[in-house]
Amino acid sequence: MHRPEWAMLLDLPTITPILTAIFGSSDYIARGGGGDFCLPGATEYQPLHSDSGDRREFNGVTFGSFRDDRNKLTLRDLPCPYVCCNFLMVDFTAINGPTRQIPATQNSPRELPRRSQEPEWMKLSTVCPAPAGSVLIRDVRAWHGGTPNLSQEVRAIPNAEFLAPWYR
């Protein structure tokens, strides 16, 4: 976020009031930025996933961001701790690899379905149509994934990420 074109995404008059409402305070933290893209000819669905989870160790490597030493809470029990703002650079259409977002899964304790077990409605739960210039504001705990890009254009989505004031 050290470049001016990225830094300007951190305090937009259209986004700041929404983030303040989500976090209940204007003291939220800009975590960073990034994004993703989907190339033309991508024919597979990206597996559903969540961008944040409980802290776990696997083969000596720590993954995840939340840990309750009492083992009473999980990340999904908390209010929204972390938001990603995806900035749509092109129109999202049914054929250019729009993001699919599965409603009401940010607090779900269920395991993510494998691609082969995914119900059809989840594959069709896409954020489209949505015009270029729109912002997809999402709780990173919610299940989401990419879809095939059957168009001839690259679909890029830069993002800015924000943490609740209480979440470190």
Predicted region positions:
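Non-heme Fe(II) oxygenase catalytic core, chiefly the N-lobe of the double-stranded beta-helix
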Residues: 1-132, 145-153, 162-168
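Short, surface-exposed secondary-structure boundary micro-motifs
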Residues: 140-141
